[in-house]
């Protein structure tokens, strides 16, 4: 099995860090392939914005994230950090999100990963069929 672990904690020696390390050790011990994205270590940009989209915009007068994500996925003009994470996700058969609960939810850096990487046109499409998205053939 190919696993992607997205880890979101600023302290590697934390309980969350230990849980991530144990997951890596356990999965590799069974012969699984494991890839880890450490959002804090890579200083992942957590804010969606116009700089996520290169090339001609769908609407240069108004920033619609959904429209720009769709266009950028169709034209291959997403920011390189997003594309790199999408490639990791496309290779994975299982996704593990390792994070602490802060203020009743995930850390902002992980929410930013979800917002930017699970882009419209990549992880889902606007119609109900879900037949066009890369991840349409498997549940997320």
Put a short name on every predicted segment.
Residues 1-99, 104-122:
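N-terminal beta1-alpha1-beta2 submodule of the flavodoxin-like/Rossmannoid cofactor-binding fold
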Residues 125-129:
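A gly/proline- and charged-residue-enriched helix-loop-helix capping module
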């Amino acid at each position: 099995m190919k696993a992607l672990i997205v880890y979101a904690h600023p302290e590697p020696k934390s309980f969350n860090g230990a849980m991530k390390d144990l997951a890596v050790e356990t999965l590799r011990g069974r012969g699984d392939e494991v890839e880890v994205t450490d959002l804090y270590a890579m200083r992942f940009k957590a804010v969606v914005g116009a700089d996520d989209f290169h090339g001609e915009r769908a609407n240069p007068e108004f920033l619609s994230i959904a429209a720009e994500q769709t266009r950028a996925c169709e034209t291959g003009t997403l920011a390189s950090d997003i594309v790199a994470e999408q490639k990791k996700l496309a290779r994975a058969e299982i996704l593990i999100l390792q994070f602490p609960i802060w203020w009743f939810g995930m850390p902002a850096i992980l929410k930013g990963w979800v917002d930017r990487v699970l882009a419209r046109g990549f992880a889902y499409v606007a119609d109900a069929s879900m037949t066009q998205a890369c991840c349409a053939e498997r549940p997320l």
